[in-house]
């Protein structure tokens, strides 16, 4: 009898809890235009313009995708910081033609941070958050 009562009450409790994905999906839709503009940009530094948006999405993200957002954001923040520490404008940096006043230590630090951005873990995490937006929210992060 208790089992029957629990089963009957479960839909009531589930209905009151709301959809934990809804807030995240709202955030995805809210930020979609900004991410679309950044994705379409030919400016190499435009990606750093997405970081505040990525932070917002990370904050809204359900637990099952939050770690992937962290894996995307952390290397980008590190690269952004290394570039700033070395006085390098992200939009103008080219590994094959670094600024003349950039010392070897700075160049190596930038290259190490850039490798992390392009690392398999980062790329896999980005693919996961993109797929999650499609699967759960029914829309891509950018169009």
Could you describe each region identified by the protein language model?
Residues 1-14:
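Sec-dependent bacterial lipoprotein signal peptides
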Residues 22-25, 29:
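Juxtamembrane membrane-water interface segments immediately C-terminal to a transmembrane helix
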Residues 30-40, 46, 93-143:
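C-terminal amphipathic alpha-helix
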Residues 15-20, 138:
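Bacterial signal peptide processing site
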Residues 31-88:
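Alpha-helical segments in soluble extracytoplasmic regions
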């Amino acid at each position: 009898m208790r089992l029957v009562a629990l089963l009957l009450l479960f839909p009531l409790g589930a209905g009151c809890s709301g959809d934990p994905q809804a807030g995240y999906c709202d955030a995805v839709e809210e930020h979609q235009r900004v991410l679309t503009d950044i994705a379409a940009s030919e400016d190499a530094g435009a990606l750093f313009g997405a970081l505040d948006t990525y932070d917002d999405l990370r904050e809204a993200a359900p637990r099952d995708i939050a770690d992937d957002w962290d894996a995307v954001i952390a290397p980008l923040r590190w690269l952004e910081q290394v570039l700033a520490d070395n006085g390098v404008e992200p939009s103008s940096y080219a590994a094959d033609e670094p600024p003349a006043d950039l010392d070897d230590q700075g160049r190596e630090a930038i290259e190490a941070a850039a490798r992390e951005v392009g690392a398999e873990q980062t790329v896999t995490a980005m693919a996961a958050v993109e797929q999650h937006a499609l699967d759960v929210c029914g829309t891509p992060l950018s169009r």
